[in-house]
């Protein structure tokens, strides 16, 4: 009889007596995996990641000093599956670190069958060709993949074996041709063995071997010896072993000589690769090599270039390795024949009995594939695990297996990994593939050229042409196709990790071989290969290791009772108890997990009648019932069985030290199985496996609702089903009426039919919003137009020619080659286009040297008319000319015309000035030359300069009087009438208009005199004109400038203060650790897994007391975001590690929305999340929506504002001890009783967006700032970009983000008036410090922030777009004397929009919300202060800049045009302001050492038109771009009434019942009575928080949470959903956490596996449902009857004082006795006498009677009983207290 023993079953490991489990439900995190890896490393054991994957940790030290760790179980699995299933298998030996040693040989030895010794010798011979020494690994493999194929028959015996490289070949570049030049690197080991293993001197002489330093290929790094830290490393000894291995595989004699000759030839040929080698040396080398290789020297010397020789060396080396492998395979095959014939044993030591089986029978193969390259191993592994488009994953999906797609970030990383090594995976389409193809083709050409030139029949030709007639087939023949192997085998993974990044030399100094450990290094390896996601995905969906055809399955297991067909198989599977996903019956195949498969195979082996099947049996204990499988109950070798040992550490904080324990382990059952099932949407109570009850992609809807056993709805009204349609009339405020009237006044000319039919605006409210938008855009345009008009054109109206006048100094500023201005006779000219022209007909050339000195000059003394021509009628001779007071500096520039002109030129013409010069110069006229009237007067008075003003014209007679003085008043030079000249002489600098007019008037009677006076005056006007007075100094021209200057000063002052503020807030003081309780709110919408994980991990890793922070994630609907593969809530729950089977009830609450949308449902999850050693409690609220929403794409979605209100309203009700809705009651229960913190302890709320990661010290800095300043109500930190270089849209935002914080917000914060605390990173104070007055959670803020009917344009922009800014505005409005701060030390990173469309959408929201918030800011009473001297008013002005951004851009464009076109004066002030603005900002960067932002500033300046013009214009016009909905349509506004058509059933507040926590806790036997709000203050708690007996783990008394680990003594029920839904019952399930067993039956702890196993006869699961007589709790609306629990011994809700850490013994003789019963006479539930006595005795034993009053004792007793005693009960209590005191 054939041996039927299963080696695998005998050798199985793990706990026995456990049934093979279904899908793994525990979530694997990096930390849990890291801890497991550390433990197995210390124990030198493997770790099973999932059924087909094992992890080991090895170093060269563990490999050298002992056998490296391998998983023999994995090899046994592969063997069992191969022989039993007759399917090929492949074990991938992957390496996650470059320093991991090879485990190929040790893994082969772990197979449960004999391996022929020749195979090991073959590996010894081949590995020196593939490995080399590197600084990080003394034996680094350089091949892509090396496979050992073991061929087995179906009995599991080895029939053949072979070695092969993959077609990816060997990395000859890094291993030979171009080894790194750093110390520690060597080439392939074989070359060093060659140089030290020559057996005889003759052989060494023949080969011409020298020292390694003589060879270019070996000398690059300067390292020639093996590492010194290897105690037994010696090239000589290794070379001897290598030579012996070659002999063992048949390489000896001539084959060996050819082999070593080729190796030596390659070494020498490497010396030709140096481009600096001389020609003679090159010839000599080629001569030597040709003799060794058997080829003509000219072939290498002349037919091959240096590049060709490079290619030839690499190709020939690979060919040589292929030849060695082929010889090895021949030797292995020969030994296998000898073994089969009985001539030899597998170990080669002797003969054995010949085997009876034949090799010609059916066979299977197991390929052990070593993949040392990290990139390749990662790519092929992740592809097979996460890629659902191919391989077995695709087969599963096609067959109907429910496979959840991998996360988008995982898929992106997988795709990147595959693209990096595409050619090795057969992907030749990308750039890497094309490059590889080019290299292969080039190699083939070179090798073929040399092969044909080689000796016929020589060794070289045989190497290159191994198969005659096929040419060069290197890389194909004798190698395996890696993608084909992966696609045709069942894959198993054996992955090696390395414990540290330390060098191997450092490991040698360690005290033990397992001392090396770096959590960061190992964690990086785990995260790089996505092993946590790997484990979660495989264990949850894909961990099927066996699959059968339907008929095959039925046939194989027919002997075990399996029937034919799918129905028969499914029935048999259920009979076996495989109902939890262990077996899946698909369309065509049956899929089995490892535990179930092995259980079936074990049972099959036990069947005697099954002996005819050729399957080995196993020796299993018949009493084990097939459970002794070596697998844990859940089918995983790593994950612990369900249930977790409780913690008895006695800590008063009691946060578990376990990892990622979700609500599934810590929340107990709920309600009565006889209570009516929930009305909550069935899709929200989806019991499908592993779906969190959230449905598939957020839209699964199962029509199976039952309201009560009869199918009737239990309430009086269903707001979801009612279809009321009605008109509502709504009061409109006076302000709204004024605005509507104003809008119609401006848009009356646009008839509504035109908008309705042409504009396609069918709804009246949409048309009204469009009109409002049009008016707003018009007003904004008007404001911008006014600003632009005021700055640019208003001054022109007041002073039309102000830009056509220049002073002499201003003219002098134009002295460039392209800016050539001059003045002449009171006029200014721009002769830039003229001065280069050759305009002289004399020998004087127009050159730059001649002309440029005149730029900016006054040319009165250079170009002047003949005196007799310009002053006619005065008898001036043509020879008369004036002597100029200022001598011309450049004589070549003097243009003297007339009599003294050059006779040979046109200047000799007396009329040249008027005929030639004047017409030409007028073409370049710019304006008047102006003189300050003060300067004219000053020079006239002080210097006696004879010039004067006539009207506004200035005339200077200095040259006239100088000439007279020189010529002693000669008559020919005294040509002006003395009455005229004397006026200028006697009144220098004065306005002589009246005097001169008087002289003219007096001369009228004397014709001769009048003629001379008039001719003299005309001469003065034509020859002595200097310009005009500077009118720009007049009030008319300066008033506008003064106004602008005033605003400029204000702006500059603000900029300066901003600068100072930025410097002021640059301190980096490290505050002391804070201890305030903080809620970290994270609203999640459509973010991706990567963003969510970053956000949650960053919050968990905050350097803050983990017990005092709570992560509260609010998922805004069940929505699949763009790029995601599953809804956002599922992503969040996956990250947090929540059990996918957890399906809490959907509880109603009131949302922010119109009409019936106010009714919403939510689910609450809680637990602990661990990241990098930080364990933080979390609360997840998923808004799942109403029943009617489940078919929609966004069920439950109400917006971010609703998510904020949900938490704010909850905390408001907690603060006021007000009645709560069912969802809030559940939240309170989870926080208070499960997490163990009284919600009222939380003092701050940190709001963080789901795509934001917070720096570690940020929270502590924010809390510290608030603790130091009690006036701070809100505070934010700096938000920077994490994707700053992702695209051009992100690059233009970097500078803006930085400067908006360090200038804008720092400036606002200086005065405590930050106007927008960003929702992505802001912390609010919940209540004031002194009196506990609510702030963020105040009624006023919540009321205004929670407006439901958002039906106007203003409200839409406030509440739908800018909720963060509006919330800040509301806080400022209601708490104006509180501060709103910014601190730059608290930092976070967020993802900016990476595309233009997203940036447009974001800025539309920001800009429009800013505009509409300005309206709200204007209404604040404290806005302007006294005479507008208020910093908030200054902040308002700063924000006003948003509206005038387009005007700013237009003005800057205008400035650029003016400067570029030289059409006006240079705007010095404007340019100086801009320089100051950006200069100060750059100075901020420099002082803060943020050098990179200077570059970002330049990018921002380039993109300034986008920010200041494009985005604002787009935003302004899209103010009405909303989804308006159809439930509420405003059909008209008249007077103070607004008419609304409601096509909606409306919202009935009764659909969301409210109940005080105390009542709810009492009714449901829950701990934590709080008392009312008044009671809170009456008992003396006005300024502090009440901390009763079990409210918090931080109170004096330990809390009563199930997290405390109290065994089975104290389990609490989660809140029952109140009326009108009665008890929202969970459907019975074996796995769900919500069940209906009463407390008396649920005594065992959810955390205790031991109790579960002991009570296995009673219950297979701690979640088992038991019937009970417990009555339903009275609903909140007083409906229904109260059923007494007759004869029920219910478990009382025990006090933490009584059951934690041994503080006191159980209360009374029976701690499980009920404390409540129904009193038929009094008609209410109360404590009976026994319970009161017990409570009194308990309290009196614990208190100090010397310090406690009787009143306090009474209060403690009532607190212990969790009820208030009145009437007879109170009298009994008082009497009993007295009696007990007497007896003490």
UniProtKB/Swiss-Prot annotation:
It is a multi-pass membrane protein. The keyword Nucleotidyltransferase does not apply. Keywords: Cell membrane, Glycoprotein, Glycosyltransferase, Membrane, Transferase, Transmembrane, Transmembrane helix, Virulence. Residues 1726-1782 form the DEK-C domain. It is found in: Cell membrane. Disruption phenotype: Results in cell wall fragility and shows high sensitivity to Congo red and calcofluor white. Leads also to high sensitivities to heat and UV-B stress. Impairs appressorium formation, affects growth of in insecta produced hyphal bodies, and alters the surface properties of conidia and hyphal bodies, resulting in defects in the ability of the mutant strains to evade insect immune responses. GO terms for cellular component: cell septum; myosin complex; plasma membrane. Residues 1-25 are annotated as: Disordered. GO terms for molecular function: ATP binding; chitin synthase activity; cytoskeletal motor activity. PANTHER family: CHITIN SYNTHASE. Polymerizes chitin, a structural polymer of the cell wall and septum, by transferring the sugar moiety of UDP-GlcNAc to the non-reducing end of the growing chitin polymer. Contributes to the production of conidia and the ability of fungal conidia to germinate. Involved in the fungal cell wall integrity and the ability of conidia to withstand biophysical pressure. Required for appressorium formation and evasion of insect cellular and/or humoral defenses, promoting the fungal dimorphic transition to the production of hyphal bodies that occurs within hosts, and ultimately to virulence. Belongs to the chitin synthase family. Class VII subfamily. This is Chitin synthase VII. It comes from Metarhizium acridum (strain CQMa 102). The gene is ChsVII.
